[in-house]
Design a protein with these regions (language model features):
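Chalcogenol-based redox active-site neighborhoods
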Residues: 1-163
Length: 163
């Protein structure tokens, strides 16, 4: 079952690269009492993700946060080492938090698992964006396969303007 607007965002453990290696991040703790924008994508260092998706959120992070968003989080089915290296490559700084769902378990719980086995990429995350307020999904934008039209930073900004 896929997560939908009005649902409570399920807890899970994601990982980010810290000074001493990967460190766990509880989704429940991350969103508690906060307004958080999540965006998920199929993979680090892939063309659309690297050329458009992440750079869009980095470029518009200040505008998004000015709308009352506490944090912007990028999630991918990659490990913390890859997400950390990709964050440096994308120059995210403190604008976007790069969290890995290495096992894909949280992605699966959300119902946003993308099967790319036939393309040699394994099980990944669908491309999406989501606004979560105090643990509840307020907006959710899931892309059609192969598309990049509704999960971008500009769309999220428009949705934040309406809230």
């Amino acid at each position: 079952m896929t997560i939908k607007v009005g649902d409570k965002l399920p807890d899970g453990t994601l990982y980010e690269m810290g000074e001493e290696g990967p460190k766990p991040v509880s989704v429940a703790e991350l969103i508690k009492g906060k307004r958080v924008v999540f965006f998920g994508l199929p993979g680090a260092f892939t063309p659309t993700c690297s050329a458009l998706h992440v750079p869009g959120y980095v470029a518009q992070a200040d505008q998004i946060k000015a709308k009352g968003v506490d944090e912007i989080v990028c999630v991918s089915v990659n490990d913390a080492f890859v997400m950390g290296a990709w964050g440096k490559d994308q120059k995210v700084g403190d604008k976007v938090r790069m969290l890995g769902d290495g096992s894909g378990l949280w992605t699966k719980v959300l119902g946003l698992e993308l099967d790319l086995i036939a393309k040699g990429l394994g099980l990944r995350c669908e491309r999406f964006s989501m606004l979560v307020e105090n643990g509840v999904v307020k907006s959710l934008n899931v892309e059609a396969p192969g598309k990049f039209e509704v999960s971008d930073a500009a769309t999220m900004l428009q949705q934040l303007d309406k809230r």
